[in-house]
Curated annotation (Swiss-Prot):
Species of provenance: Campylobacter jejuni subsp. jejuni serotype O:2 (strain ATCC 700819 / NCTC 11168)
Family that this chain belongs to: Belongs to the universal ribosomal protein uS17 family.
Keyword Nucleotide-binding included in the entry's annotation: no
GO cellular component: cytosolic small ribosomal subunit
Ranges in coiled-coil conformation: none
NCBIfam families in the record: PRK05610.1, uS17_bact
Protein name per the record: Small ribosomal subunit protein uS17
Protein keywords: Ribonucleoprotein, Ribosomal protein, RNA-binding, rRNA-binding
Gene: rpsQ
A Pfam family per the record: Ribosomal_S17
Length: 83
């Protein structure tokens, strides 16, 4: 079985039926100034049972493309958000 990428982030939006938008933060070193800066990217993840809410911290695993922009499937919910 091939290695599957895993991403960890915060749910920022419920983007439709069985879909959530997750904001993933990564830290990179700036090429010129050598300072660690944060970079953010949003991914659409597939949530089969509609169990996530806005603010939850989740882990998603890479899968085959489920739609034009959706290539990750929900693996687990690490922490629930405060609402």
């Amino acid at each position: 079985m091939a290695f599957k990428r895993e991403i960890q982030g915060v749910v920022v939006k419920i983007a439709g039926e069985k879909t959530a938008s997750v904001l993933v933060e990564r830290k990179v070193v700036h090429p010129r100034y050598r300072k660690i800066v944060k970079r953010f990217k949003k991914y659409l993840i597939h949530d089969e049972r509609n169990e996530v809410k806005v603010g939850d911290t989740v882990v998603a695993v890479e899968c085959r493309p489920l739609s034009k922009r959706k290539s990750f499937r929900l693996k687990s919910v690490l922490a629930t958000g405060v609402e």
